[in-house]
């Protein structure tokens, strides 16, 4: 009986083990899947919680923004646009260790007729950013000053470069070649992602910019996120309206030509012809090419397709061109490769927005007559770099926004000097039927021809080597007073006195509206603006 009972127990145990093994075989795979699924849910919940608590960065899942490629934390700064400002900024921030995602509409070499002359002050900023080698290997030409022509007279204004290294000078080049060099240098850094795509909008949540939505070159719609988005998408920016109050003016248009295989009368100098109705510019952009820019007042130029523009260039402009350049100018017109573009000006009027910043032509423009745009942009980038350097974490967008308000005041000495000079010089250099304006134009040419401080002071301002608004103000009214003095000496008749008074009033009418748009306090007394003293936030 004991033997029978033992056998029964053994059989029962054996049956139980067989049943258990069968159950394990049937459900083992399901248990594994259940365990993995639960683990992944727990991990995802933990990550979301950490992200919400530590960075306050993200958007609702219902919007479709979270994908494995753009979970917050993989990028520190998004840069929209990779022109001069965007590519220089990308290299600068990445060189400081930031993870940078650049989204540019077109990464092929651009072909523009402006952004081709970098002033010495801008070249110094290029050195400061470690980008000076980007003017090498593109056939860039050194520029040492300007030659000024008016009514058969000419004078030469040289940059005051005596105190600088021999390499410091202006540079003129093909804009596209220069930009490509900077893009390549930025993209060579491992923490820069350079992508071709069109940014369609900023992603905002609770008043803060969290990133951008964009279309890739294949048409795929994606989103990218970062604690700071910097918009540098140029003069045609479609994003600036939410970040500033854009008051764009178009005082004139440029007509661009290229003269080939000829030298300028004054080697290594830009040439400005004070023509009627407005200035003409010449400068070398390669060893064999001279860029000619003809300013046409107003928002429209004569029609190209019916030959009206070519006729205008031959009959109105060509007779005012220096005789050494006349034949090459006519040949360039006949060749037919005529380009046009509107000249825009827009004072900086930002809406400080947490998580976002505007830079470059998207933020601030001035008439390109003085070639100061790249100098302003590079100077702004140096400031942004210095302001961001002490910060390890950019996620506190409100605090960062308040801190970066200092940028708008700190940039004023350079930006307002170059902006004001560009706007004022353009108005003075244009021909006018008004007798007082004519006297101001003649006085300006003769004042610059005096030499010494009368030429070195203004050219130091224009070059970005001496960005002092008070110096600009004093030289501008010195020109006006010089013009009045010429009218009153030797015989101050009532007619001449009245003309002198009109000259002063006209000069005031030119410069004071520009100063007002730049901001009187920020321009001349930045130290009394509270934002000037903003300290880096302590984390």
From Swiss-Prot:
Keyword presence, DNA damage: no
GO annotation, biological process: response to ethylene; response to hydrogen peroxide; response to jasmonic acid; response to metal ion; response to molecule of fungal origin; response to nitric oxide; response to salicylic acid; response to vanadate(3-)
Binding site for FAD: 84-85, 104-105, 112, 183, 199, 361, 374
Pfam family, one: SE
Assigned keywords, A-Z: Endoplasmic reticulum, FAD, Flavoprotein, Isoprene biosynthesis, Membrane, Microsome, Oxidoreductase, Transmembrane, Transmembrane helix
Superkingdom of this protein's organism: Eukaryota
Regions crossing the membrane: 22-42, 71-91, 472-492
Induction summary: Induced by jasmonic acid (JA) and methyl jasmonate (MeJA) in adventitious roots. Induced by chitosan (CHN). Accumulates upon Cle-mediated signaling, an elicitor derived from fungal cell walls of C.lagenarium, thus inducing the accumulation of saponins. Triggered by ethylene (ACC), rose bengal (RB), nitric oxide (NO). Accumulates in response to hydrogen peroxide (H(2)O(2)). Accumulates in the presence of squalene. Induced by N,N'-dicyclohexylcarbodiimide (DCCD) in a nitric oxide (NO) dependent manner thus leading to increased ginsenosides accumulation.
Described function: Component of the triterpene saponins (e.g. ginsenosides or panaxosides) and phytosterols biosynthetic pathways. Catalyzes the first oxygenation step in sterol biosynthesis and is suggested to be one of the rate-limiting enzymes in this pathway.
Name of the protein: Squalene monooxygenase SE1
Organism: Panax ginseng (Korean ginseng)
Lineage start: Eukaryota, Viridiplantae, Streptophyta, Embryophyta, Tracheophyta
């Amino acid at each position: 009986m004991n033997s029978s009972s033992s056998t029964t127990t053994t059989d029962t145990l054996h049956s139980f083990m067989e049943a258990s093994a069968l159950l394990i075989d049937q459900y083992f795979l399901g248990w594994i899947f259940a365990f993995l699924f639960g683990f992944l849910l727990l991990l995802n919940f933990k990550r979301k919680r950490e992200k919400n608590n530590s960075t306050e960065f993200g958007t609702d899942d219902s919007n479709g923004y979270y994908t494995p490629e753009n979970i917050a934390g993989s990028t520190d700064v998004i840069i929209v646009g990779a022109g001069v400002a965007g590519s220089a900024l990308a290299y600068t921030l990445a060189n400081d260790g930031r993870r940078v995602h650049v989204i540019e509409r077109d990464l092929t070499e651009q072909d523009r007729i402006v952004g081709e002359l970098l002033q010495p002050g801008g070249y110094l900023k290029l050195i400061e950013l470690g980008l000076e080698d980007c003017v090498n290997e593109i056939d860039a030409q050194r520029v040492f000053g300007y030659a000024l022509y008016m009514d058969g007279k000419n004078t030469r204004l040289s940059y005051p470069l005596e105190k600088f290294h021999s390499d410091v000078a202006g540079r003129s080049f093909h804009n596209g070649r220069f930009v490509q060099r900077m893009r390549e240098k930025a993209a060579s850094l491992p923490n820069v992602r350079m992508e071709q795509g069109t940014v369609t909008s900023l992603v905002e949540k609770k008043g803060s910019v969290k990133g951008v939505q964009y279309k890739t070159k294949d048409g795929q719609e994606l989103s990218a996120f970062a604690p700071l988005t910097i918009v540098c998408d140029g003069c045609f920016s479609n994003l600036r309206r939410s970040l500033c109050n854009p008051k764009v003016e178009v005082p004139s248009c440029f007509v661009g030509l290229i003269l080939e295989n000829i030298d300028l009368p004054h080697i290594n100098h830009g040439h400005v012809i004070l023509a009627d109705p407005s200035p003409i510019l010449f400068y070398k952009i390669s060893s064999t090419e001279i860029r000619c820019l003809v300013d046409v007042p107003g928002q429209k130029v004569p029609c190209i397709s019916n030959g009206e523009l070519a006729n205008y260039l031959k009959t109105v402009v060509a007779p005012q061109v220096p005789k050494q350049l006349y034949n090459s100018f006519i040949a360039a017109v006949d060749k037919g490769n005529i380009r046009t573009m509107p000249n825009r000006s827009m004072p900086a009027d930002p809406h400080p927005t947490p998580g976002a910043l505007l830079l470059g032509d998207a933020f601030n423009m001035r008439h390109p007559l003085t070639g100061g745009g790249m100098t302003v942009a590079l100077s702004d980038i140096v400031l942004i770099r210095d302001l961001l350097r002490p910060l390890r974490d950019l996620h506190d967008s409100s605090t960062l926004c308040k801190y970066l308000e200092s940028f708008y005041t700190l940039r004023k000495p350079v930006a307002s000097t170059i902006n004001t000079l560009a706007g004022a010089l353009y108005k003075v250099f244009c021909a006018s039927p008004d007798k007082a304006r004519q006297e101001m134009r003649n006085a300006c040419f003769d004042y610059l021809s005096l030499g010494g401080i009368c030429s070195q002071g203004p050219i130091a301002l224009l070059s970005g080597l001496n960005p002092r608004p008070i110096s600009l103000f004093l030289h501008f009214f010195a020109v006006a007073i010089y013009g009045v003095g010429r009218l009153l000496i030797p015989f101050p008749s009532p007619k001449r006195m009245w003309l002198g008074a009109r000259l002063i009033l006209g000069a005031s009418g030119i410069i004071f509206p520009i100063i007002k748009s730049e901001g009187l306090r920020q321009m001349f007394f930045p130290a009394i603006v509270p934002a000037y003293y903003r300290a880096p936030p302590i984390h």
